[in-house]
Every structure is written in C-alpha cells, then in structure tokens.
C-alpha cells in the first residue's frame, strides 16, 4: 500500500515575474509503506523541492500530495499532526541544534507533541541508542561535540518523534567515509526497529546502491525513472546523458567484463564485486589458494 502519493505535483517559483521557473513538473509518484527509496539527480533537478512538499513545507502550485490516501492540504488544522508523521532532516541539520544539552535538543520534538515527560525521556534514550550517543554525551552541550556527533543529535531529534516516514536530504554530506557509513547504518537501524518508510536524497551512487531498495531519478523537475536499484543502474548510458553515473565499482566491473571476466551486470556494491571475483578466482584456480 502506498503511504505517500503525489498526483500531478507541480511547483513554480516566482509566478508572474520574469524569473518564473517550474521546479517540479507534474510528478506522479507512489511510495510504498516500509520501503527505502534513494532519490538522485543532478543539482537543480528538483529533488529538494519535491521532498519539501511531502511534509507540507511547500504547497503545490498544482496537484496533490496524499498521505495514506488523504490530501495533506485538505484540512490545515491537521497539518501539524501530519508533520509529526512525516519527518524531514535538512542538509547539514547540525546547524539547527540550539538547546543547552543534547538530551534537551532531542526531547524538543516529542515535547511539542504533547507527550508525557516519562514518554519523552524514554524516546530520548531510545533514539540516542539508535544513533550511538552515550548517556554521558546526552548531558553535554551539543555545541561542544564533533561535526559527526552534532549530525547524530539533529537526526535523533527527528527520529524521537517516531515519524512513519523519515526523509533525509544529504544526511552524510561533508562526512568522512566511516562517518557516512555509520550514519546510514543508524538510519537503517531506525527503519528496522520502527518499520518506517525512508526517503534518502544523496549524490552518492554507492550509498544509494548499498542501502536503498528502489531509486527515484529526478531530471529537470520530472521523474526520469523510478525502479529497483538494479533496473536503474543498468541504464548507465541514459544516466550519464543527464549528468549522473553508476557506482564506481559498477564501472570497474563493466571494464573487467569487457575483458572477459565472467561477472554479471548487476554489481553495484564492493561487497557484490568481491563475492563474484572470489568465486571466479576459485573456479579458475580449481579451489586452491586464497585471495
């Protein structure tokens, strides 16, 4: 069942001025409940504008956004409750922290939901554990933490509201490879624990390939394609034509396959490549030796 749908979603900036521009152009989309969707596209493709419609930060110029089949703009009185159900983490969310302790910052959202203090504290502890923040860190000022820890605090603040849909705009931007993978694993842990739907905007084809089950490709404000990871990345020439690329390991394996190495055309992660190369090595070596 689709948890989020868009019907003819269109958004224009600067209507009636010489600077009028269509940022999202008649987008029809269905996001299944519990899915992990990667959203990719070159700069200016409409990714960020699209996701800001999904929790009502922007109102469509035309079309609808539906949450569980209900138009989110049908009743403005219910908009606040809807935003608790659809959480949005902006790029560089650590710039939005403001409380005097980490615990208070994470608790801000749940308190605004009107929850009992006991429930608020339970959510703080639970979410801190998901993102790897210790009890000692909860007592500290968030402004004294490292960049990666601040990022975790900000993400935890949204997770603590337990949104059914969690949308993240480049949550790993500016982090080193280890920090990037840790953040993505924590997002995956939240999904595993809550069954939430995850929408991840990313410029990293590798991150999307490792974690997403489906990929939405945006181009010039329109849906270029929306399909499984394998089906999207098999369209490498079409992706390159719109300024995107397949994961680097896929390009390496394509080159090896062109030179006679018997690899399949659905390798999109280093782990997949390693498995197939090891199998090929052992076949050619008769099962002898190690790699």
Q: Which role fits each region the language model picked out?
A:
Residues 220-221:
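Conserved ABC ATPase "signature" C-loop
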Residues 166-169:
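Catalytic Walker B motif of ABC-type/P-loop ATPase nucleotide-binding domains
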Residues 15, 64-81:
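ABC ATPase NBD Q-loop/coupling interface
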């Amino acid at each position: 069942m689709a948890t989020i749908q868009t019907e003819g979603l269109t958004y224009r900036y600067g209507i009636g001025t010489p600077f009028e521009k269509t940022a999202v152009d008649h987008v029809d989309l269905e996001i299944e409940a519990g899915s992990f969707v990667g959203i990719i596209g070159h700069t200016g493709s409409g990714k960020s504008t699209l996701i800001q419609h999904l929790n009502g930060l922007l109102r469509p110029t035309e079309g609808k956004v539906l949450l569980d089949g209900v138009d989110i703009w049908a009743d403005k009185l219910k908009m606040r409750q809807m935003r608790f159900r659809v959480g949005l983490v902006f790029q560089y969310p650590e710039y939005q922290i403001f409380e005097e302790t980490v615990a208070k910052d994470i608790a801000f959202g749940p308190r605004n939901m009107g929850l009992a203090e006991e429930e608020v504290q339970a959510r703080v502890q639970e979410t801190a554990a998901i993102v790897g923040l210790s009890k000692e860190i909860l007592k500290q000022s968030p402004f004294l933490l490292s960049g990666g820890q601040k990022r975790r605090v900000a993400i935890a603040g949204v997770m603590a509201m337990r949104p059914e849909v969690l949308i993240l705009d480049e949550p790993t931007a500016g982090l080193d490879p280890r920090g990037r993978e840790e953040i993505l694993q924590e997002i995956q842990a939240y999904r595993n624990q809550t069954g939430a739907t995850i929408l991840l905007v990313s410029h990293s084809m590798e991150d999307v390939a490792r974690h997403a089950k489906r990929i939405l490709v945006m181009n010039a404000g329109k849906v270029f394609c929306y399909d499984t990871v394998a089906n999207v990345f098999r369209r490498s020439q079409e992706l390159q034509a719109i300024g995107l690329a397949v994961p680097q390991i896929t390009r390496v394996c394509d080159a090896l396959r062109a030179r006679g190495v018997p690899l399949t055309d659905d390798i999109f992660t280093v782990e997949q490549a390693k498995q197939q190369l090891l199998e090929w090595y052992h076949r050619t070596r008769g099962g002898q030796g190690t790699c």
